[in-house]
Swiss-Prot record:
<dbReference type="InterPro" id="IPR001117">
    <property type="entry name" value="Cu-oxidase_2nd"/>
</dbReference>
<dbReference type="InterPro" id="IPR033138">
    <property type="entry name" value="Cu_oxidase_CS"/>
</dbReference>
<dbReference type="InterPro" id="IPR011707">
    <property type="entry name" value="Cu-oxidase-like_N"/>
</dbReference>
<comment type="similarity">
    <text>Belongs to the multicopper oxidase family.</text>
</comment>
<feature type="glycosylation site" description="N-linked (GlcNAc...) asparagine">
    <location>
        <position position="122"/>
    </location>
</feature>
<feature type="domain" description="Plastocyanin-like 2">
    <location>
        <begin position="164"/>
        <end position="330"/>
    </location>
</feature>
<keyword id="KW-0479">Metal-binding</keyword>
<keyword id="KW-0560">Oxidoreductase</keyword>
<dbReference type="InterPro" id="IPR002355">
    <property type="entry name" value="Cu_oxidase_Cu_BS"/>
</dbReference>
<comment type="subunit">
    <text>Dimer.</text>
</comment>
<keyword id="KW-0325">Glycoprotein</keyword>
<feature type="binding site" description="type 2 copper site">
    <location>
        <position position="90"/>
    </location>
    <ligand>
        <name>Cu cation 1</name>
    </ligand>
</feature>
<dbReference type="InterPro" id="IPR034259">
    <property type="entry name" value="CuRO_1_AAO"/>
</dbReference>
<feature type="disulfide bond">
    <location>
        <begin position="111"/>
        <end position="568"/>
    </location>
</feature>
<feature type="binding site" description="type 3 copper site">
    <location>
        <position position="538"/>
    </location>
    <ligand>
        <name>Cu cation 2</name>
    </ligand>
</feature>
<dbReference type="GO" id="GO:0008447">
    <property type="term" value="F:L-ascorbate oxidase activity"/>
</dbReference>
<dbReference type="GO" id="GO:0009506">
    <property type="term" value="C:plasmodesma"/>
</dbReference>
């Protein structure tokens, strides 16, 4: 009897401690479970001092910041309170190893969450870094559905650089026209382009019809703000003689941006959640989908405040710079700097943009890429007309997502859910990237590039002339489910001669990369994350117009997928027939 009682005691203790783990959200390895309950809904807001409708979370715009340590589990209970729209949220830069269904891409990883429904996102944040989240259905990111996601090192570990304080900055662009009107315009004959944004927002705040720097330009209307308005500048409060880390992420729908602080050099230390070899610069270019950490030292005249300026690059500017203050405490925020804000470099100075981008290399000790790849895919970016509609296409295929999510369709072998013929992996060698496209074979499609697990893949992104003469645009491309090595950039068409210029020594790891006008960008990644993953231009209207592809790898190895992720299209029928 006594022996039996002793045998049961450890089991009771195990259950007791397991209960504590659940109650306090602490895993057995010291990581935590961080639970959030979010309600997504439209609400009236005035991001740039003009009232409009934004998509917010729990009454906040931008949405709440998620903060966790590497190794933590994040659980987001998402309730869709939109009246007539579905919703999903993509966790930008989070690899979703083991949870591809939680990537938050409608028609790829999951079904859209219907109005009134609740969906639980449950995933592990593996790596420290500066990330963010955003809507990934239609153009909901442009409507304001985004927020910050910051991952600190695991408990007991430190960053490889010192700083005394931290400032988190989320950059976005804002239109007064609704996303629904924008979507209809983009899908019309003839196309109605969305135009340039009205305002650049810093942490969801900007000024459309006034300027906080009006004293330097008599043509500008001064702002008369008390500081409590939703459009009042988000002030960077700092103490003199300290080092601050500024985490910067761009959720813009269209704009490429330039960030600068008057009189303060920026030390770049992180890009897309990966450490880089530190380097100083006066300003940084940041494209949609990218994130950076920069360090600044507050060693300037402590009796002054300094301008923080965010201007547009890469497109002919029709949007004033977003402004705020670096406020040296205890100075009053009403004390404006003695000089004008930093001037944004010329919008079309692409050499300057390239020089900044080329300086980004991996920090010492970072993982190196495999020496050779098993497979190489060339992706030609072109603008085309299909049945009178203006579309973007990759290798003459404009992506239109199917009603059944790829992940479920491939998991349950639903062969009719999407085109079983893979898209082209090359484009014609004689294609002239310097002239407008004339190929009449461009089509709408939804085929998939499939990889074997462990396959080492090179992707060559090739830019080209648009339909208008002498015009080629910057495109930032984002890959879900992976980081990749950026092996190189170049002007013109990629050829075999470019092979020797590829960087295999210290290429940076990124999840978003830019291709410059009339140029190419080469990346390499390992297909080691079972799932189905989007790879697309992060400019919202370009993706809406078909500028993306879909990668799949090892779907047969994917574990159980939550039923709610598949409750639409052909997978819904499978669930009904096979409960």
């Amino acid at each position: 009897m006594l022996q039996m009682g002793k045998a049961r005691e450890p089991n009771f203790l195990i259950l007791f401690f397991f209960g504590l783990i659940l109650a306090f959200g602490i895993s057995s390895e010291g990581s935590q479970i961080r639970h959030y309950k979010w309600e997504v809904e439209y609400m009236f807001w005035a991001p740039d001092c003009n009232e409009n409708i934004v998509m917010g979370i729990n009454g906040q715009f931008p949405g709440p910041t998620i903060r966790a340590n590497a190794g933590d589990t994040v659980v987001v209970e998402l309730i869709n309170k939109l009246h007539t729209e579905g919703v999903v949220i993509h966790w930008h830069g989070i690899l979703q190893r083991g949870t591809p269904w939680a990537d938050g891409t409608a028609s790829i990883s999951q079904c859209a969450i219907n109005p009134g429904e609740t969906f639980f996102y449950n995933f592990t944040v593996d790596n420290p870094g500066t990330f963010f989240y955003h809507g990934h259905l239609g153009m909901q990111r442009s409507a304001g559905l985004y927020g910050s996601l910051i991952v600190d090192p695991p408990q007991g570990k430190k960053e490889p650089f010192h700083y005394d304080g931290e400032i988190n900055l989320l950059l976005s662009d804002w239109w007064h026209q609704s996303i629904h009107k924008q979507e209809v315009g983009l899908s019309s004959k003839p196309i109605r382009w969305i135009g340039e944004p009205q305002t650049i927002l810093l942490n969801g705040r900007g000024q459309f019809d006034c300027s906080i720097a009006a004293k330097y330009d008599s043509n500008l209307e001064p702002c008369k703000l008390k500081g409590s308005e939703p459009c009042a500048p988000y002030i960077f409060h700092v103490m003199p003689k300290k080092t601050y880390r500024i985490r910067i992420a761009s959720t813009t729908a269209l704009a490429a941006l330039n960030f600068a602080i008057g009189n303060h050099p920026l030390l770049v230390v992180e890009a897309d959640g990966n450490y880089v070899q530190p380097f100083y610069t006066s300003d940084i270019d940041i494209y949609s989908g990218e994130s950076y950490s920069v360090l600044i030292t507050t060693d300037q005249n402590p009796s002054e405040n300094y301008w923080v300026s965010v201007g547009t690059r890469g497109r002919h500017p029709n949007t004033p710079p977003g402004l705020t203050l670096l406020n040296y405490l205890p100075n009053s925020v009403s004390k404006l700097p003695t000089s004008p804000p930093p001037e944004t470099p010329a919008w079309d100075d692409f050499d300057r943009s390239k020089n900044f981008t080329y300086r980004i290399t991996a920090a010492m000790g970072s993982p190196k890429p495999p020496v050779k790849s098993n497979r190489r895919i060339f992706l030609l970016n072109t603008q085309n007309v299909i049945n009178g509609y203006v579309k973007w296409a990759i290798n003459d295929v404009s992506l239109a997502l199917p009603p059944t999510p790829y992940l479920g369709a491939m998991k349950f072998n639903l062969l009719h859910a999407f085109d079983q013929n893979p898209p082209p992996e090359v484009f014609p060698e004689d294609y002239d990237i310097d002239t407008p496209p004339t190929n009449e074979k461009t089509k709408i499609g939804n085929g998939v590039y499939q990889f074997k697990i462990g396959e080492i893949v090179d992707v060559i992104l090739q830019n080209a002339n648009m339909m208008k003469e002498n015009l080629s645009e910057i495109h930032p491309w984002h890959l879900h489910g992976h980081d990749f090595w950026v092996l190189g950039y170049g002007d013109g068409k990629f050829t075999a001669e470019e092979e020797s210029s590829l960087n295999l020594k210290n290429p940076p790891l990124r999840n978003t990369v830019v291709i410059f006008p009339y140029g190419w960008t080469a990346i390499r990644f390992v297909a080691d994350n079972p799932g189905v993953w989007a790879f697309h231009c992060h400019i919202e209207p370009h993706l809406h117009m078909g500028m993306g592809v879909v990668f799949a790898e090892g779907v047969e190895k994917v574990g159980r997928i939550p039923t709610k992720a598949l409750a639409c299209g052909g997978t819904a029928k499978s669930l009904i027939n096979n409960p």
